Amino acid sequence: MKFHFEKILPGPGESFVTEKMTGPTLDCVYHVHPECELTWIESGFGSRFIGDSIEPFSAGDLVLIGGSVPHHYLTLESDSTGPEWSKTCVVKFSPAFCGRTFLELPEFEAVSQMLQEAERGLHFPEESAAEAVPLLQKLFRENGARRLLALLELLELLSRLPRRTLSGSAIRPEAAPDERLNRVLRLIHRRLALGRPIPLAEAAAEACLTPTAFSRYFRRATRKRFIDYVTELKLSRAAGKLARSDRPIVEIAFESGFYNLSNFNRQFQNSRKMTPRAYRNSYRRIDLQHAAP
């Protein structure tokens, strides 16, 4: 699998990178880097792609990925109108940032195990994220040795918190970047933002391949059929809209690229193991719990 390779360069006197990103959208190409990455979404919503996983994200989302895991966060323009911009905190660190024998120490066995699991991507549920975020924010405030100690403290805490894996398997990309794949993905995302269909023939033309050759290429590159990838992305968009609005389900289905409500309900049930209405109600229960004194 080929993706854009990102080179991570810590600043002077630093062994790892911290970044805060603010703007109307998050739109990065599929990329990889040898460093582990911890990403917290302070505000904003969209779709995240970790290995072969496609899921919606919203404020509070906390994900840890291992080195060389293909990933991509996307907020589409139509999802980012108004004052709610995306705010994201990212920490990128080498597993050997404390020395190559660090993870072999018995005191950090749980951390080592967690970083191995992170090769498939790890999502921390809301309760876990809420417990970890204060330490993450502390990390961004510290300097020097205190900054390093804050990262160690954060990783130790995360190793004890509930989490779930995202990708069905660990995916190892090829070293060479593939701009052709990113061109196709940008086309897909633009079309979904406009609510327009994406014919396979047009995607194939963007990649300068015949439809048959493109189908083989896309499946080899993403481990998904083209139609399955597009469907999962549309379902991810629909899930995000269901969670944060009371608009009619049929309207959300149409906006997300499903022009038959029965087909949308069936696809959503197969993907999320619940109906769109039940999915929306599950988020309402969470909101009510948070609103309770």
Where are these regions (language model features)?
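Generic protein-terminus/edge-of-domain signal
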Residues: 1-63, 290-293
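A hydrophobic/aromatic-rich effector-binding and dimerization subdomain
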Residues: 6-10, 69-138
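Residue at a beta-strand N-cap/secondary-structure junction
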Residues: 47, 54, 197, 246-247, ...
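Conserved long hydrophobic alpha-helices within structured protein cores
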Residues: 56-73, 151-158
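An amphipathic alpha-helical interaction segment
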Residues: 108, 114-120, 126-173, 179
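Basic, amphipathic alpha-helical hairpins
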Residues: 138-146, 159-167, 176, 183-199, ...
